[in-house]
Amino acid sequence: MGSSANNPNLTPIDLTVHQRASTRKPSFWSGLGWRDGVFAVLMIALFAYGGLKNRDLMDVYEEVILVFSVLSIVLLGWFWRPLQWIFAVVAAISLLAVSWYGGDLTRGETVFGLKYMFASQPLVMWMSVLFILATVAYWVGLIWPKLTTISWLGSKLTYAGLVMGSAALMVRWYESYLIAPDVGHIPVSTLYEVFILFALLTTAFYLYYEEHYD
C-alpha cells in the first residue's frame, strides 16, 4: 500500500492538512506519565502537611506564597524531569537533618551525621568538592573525547553537587530559626547564601542544556 502522498483521491489541501497533522508535536499534557502524577501528589501532600502544621504562624500572604511554590515545583518537575528526583532527594536530606537536630542547634556539633554530612556548612563543603571533581572530569573528557565515561562521571558529580547545595540552603533555613525565631530568614539574605544560590542556578541551567543538546 502506498502512502497518503501517493493517493490520487487526496486534494492538495488534504495533503497539506495531513502533513501538518503528522508533523505536529504532542502537547505538553499528553506527554505526562504516571510518575509525573505521583510526583505531583507527593509534593502537594508534603506542602499541605507543612502548611496545615504551621497554619497558625502564617498570614494570608505566606499561604499564597506556599500555594504558588508547590505549583511552581510541580510544573518545573514536569518540564524537566530530573528535577523530580532532585527535589525528592533534597527533601529527604532536609527532613533527615531536621529530625537529627531535634530543635537543638548544638547537636550540629555532636551528632556525627550533622557535623560531617548534613548540617548546612558540611553540605556546602560537599557541594564545593563535588563541583571541583566534576570540573576536573569535564576537562579530562574535553581533552580526551574518547573517554566518554569520564564525561558521564562529570555529569553525575555535578548532579550530586546540585543536590548537596540545594539541601544546604534548606537546612540553613531551619538552622536560622534554631538560633532565634527573629533571626530566622529565607536563605538568600546574605552574600554567602547568594553565592551558593548563584552556583546552584548556574549548575541547573548547565545540566538542562547538557541534556537538551546531548
Mark where each language-model region is.
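Hydrophobic cores of alpha-helical transmembrane segments in multi-pass integral membrane proteins
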Residues: G2-T110, A119-D214
